[in-house]
């Protein structure tokens, strides 16, 4: 029993180490060759939202941000990423209800932070007929761009995530102990009362 408790404690400490390792800088570095928007309609004055006008498409944008999110600044430690591809309609929930979207991907560091990357490529807009797409051309400071990329990041406080983890980890230990005791009792009952 003491060995399993020691394993539980070591695993908990390793996960705590993961939780306290610094994350990549959020917001990430600016998208190269892409002016940052200062328009109210792009960010709605949300502190955790920025937008860029760019000629880069999804195939270039997503690898750029995945590369930004791959490693911790602490000893270049590799962090696990989960990439979730959301339907474009979900952008209205993540950003605001009038957000145009062609793709919406979420880069998640489990139990730590998330970065939403929303891209609107007006020439590929699946919600608008080809003949009507020109009305949604992305123009910024007199220059026409192929797309607009909007980012939203969500961080969590390291102390809060550690407190939640240890509470859940303790509940898991208690639940597993109770489950083992119940299974053990069940087999003893079967052995003593059914099998003779």
PLM regions: where:
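An acidic-aromatic pocket/loop used at catalytic or ligand-binding sites
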Residues: 1-49, 53-196
């Amino acid at each position: 029993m003491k060995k399993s408790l020691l394993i539980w404690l070591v695993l908990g400490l390793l996960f705590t180490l993961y939780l306290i390792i610094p994350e990549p800088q959020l917001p990430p570095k600016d998208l190269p060759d892409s002016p940052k928007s200062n328009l109210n309609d792009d960010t709605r004055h949300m502190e955790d939202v920025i937008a860029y006008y760019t000629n880069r498409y999804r195939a270039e944008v997503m690898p750029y941000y995945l590369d930004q999110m791959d490693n911790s600044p602490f000893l270049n430690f590799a962090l696990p990423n989960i990439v979730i591809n959301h339907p474009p309609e979900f952008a209205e929930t993540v950003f605001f209800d009038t957000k145009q979207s062609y793709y919406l991907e979420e880069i998640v560091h489990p139990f730590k932070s998330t970065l939403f990357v929303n891209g609107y490529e007006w020439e590929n807009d699946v919600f608008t007929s080809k003949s009507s797409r020109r009305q949604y051309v992305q123009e910024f400071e007199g220059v026409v761009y192929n797309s607009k990329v909007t980012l939203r990041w969500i961080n969590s406080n390291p102390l809060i995530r550690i407190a939640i983890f240890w509470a859940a980890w303790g509940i898991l230990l208690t639940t597993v102990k109770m489950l083992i005791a119940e299974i053990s009792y069940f087999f003893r009952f079967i052995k003593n009362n059914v099998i003779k």
